[in-house]
Regions:
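Core catalytic region of metal-dependent phosphoesterases/phosphodiesterases
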Residues: 14-20, 24, 29-124
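Structural motif
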Residues: 20-21, 52-53, 127-129, 212, ...
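Conserved histidine-centered catalytic loops in small-molecule metabolism enzymes
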Residues: 26, 259-260
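Conserved beta-sheet core of the metallophosphoesterase superfamily
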Residues: 110-117, 130, 135, 139-151, ...
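Active-site-proximal loop/helix segment associated with metal-binding centers of metalloenzymes
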Residues: 134-196
Length: 260
């Protein structure tokens, strides 16, 4: 049975399956406007007692890097909410995306989040699910995969750690792409979203044990029943859609957050 320990709080044990699961992705905290961030915090506050598990499928943060002795101030509100959520008994699992793959021990040891190496196959609401953020999965993305391998290497992390956050953060923001998406200067890549959906269909065809394929990255909410009882799910984003998915043993629903 997986076990999560968080410094300064009780140990929490979770069963191998969850009856009610929320999936969210591409929140991009640190770049979305304050009202969007507050909406996501309100969303998290609504979850205790309502669900068993939260899966964050990449790009929770627009940029995340674990320094040895500091955390980024801008993320304190969401880290506090996530820690409180774990304390109520909600299991939180996190897949690193292309913006926040530089995770380390802090999120697990201090917050209580389980970090997943994706692509991975896990159980979500009694369904066998193939889960990945979605970046670098398609044919023709070999150059990106090579670049990703370099920037996620131990040597690159060590070099990046030498730069103080006040210097590195503005540089990262310039190459993020999220500000342009917020301002409407970066259009949705519909062709890539379509190709990722086709990849999901191929996975379901090739792996009959799967009930569900879950991707993020495209920022396009999608729920497709490929064949009876077998689905492709993309939870969308919180830049434009404020969308998420609710999975139970009986159903899968795409929803949009509208706080009262």
């Amino acid at each position: 049975m997986p076990r999560v320990s968080r410094s300064g709080s009780r140990d929490l044990s979770f069963g191998m399956t969850a009856q009610s699961t929320i999936v969210a992705s591409d929140v991009h905290l640190g770049e979305i406007p304050p009202d969007g961030e507050q909406a996501f915090l309100s969303f998290l506050e609504s979850l205790p007692g309502a669900i068993d598990e939260l899966l964050i499928n990449g790009d929770l943060f627009d940029f995340w890097f674990e320094y040895r002795s500091v955390i980024l101030r801008r993320y304190f509100p969401v880290l506090r909410r996530l820690a409180d959520l774990v304390d109520t008994g909600v299991r939180i699992r996190l897949v690193g995306g292309n913006h926040d793959a530089w995770t380390g021990s802090f999120l697990g040891d201090e917050i209580g989040i389980e970090l997943l190496d994706a692509p991975t196959t896990i159980t979500l609401a009694n369904r066998r699910a193939y889960v990945a953020h979605g970046d670098g999965l398609l044919a023709g993305e070999g150059a990106y995969r090579a670049f990703r391998g370099v920037i996620r290497s131990r040597a690159f992390r060590a070099l990046f750690r030498l730069a103080p956050p006040d210097l590195s953060l503005p540089l990262v923001r310039r190459v993020s792409g999220t500000p342009a998406r917020l301002e409407g200067q970066a259009g949705d890549d519909h062709e890539r979203a379509d190709r990722l959906g086709e990849h999901a269909r191929s996975l379901l065809a090739d792996r009959p044990e799967l009930d569900l394929v879950v991707f993020g990255d495209t920022h396009r909410p999608e729920l497709v029943e490929v064949e009876p009882g077998r689905h492709y799910l993309n939870a969308g984003d919180w830049i434009h859609h404020r969308s998420y998915a609710l999975l139970t043993a009986e159903s899968i629903e795409l929803r949009h957050w509208h706080p009262d």
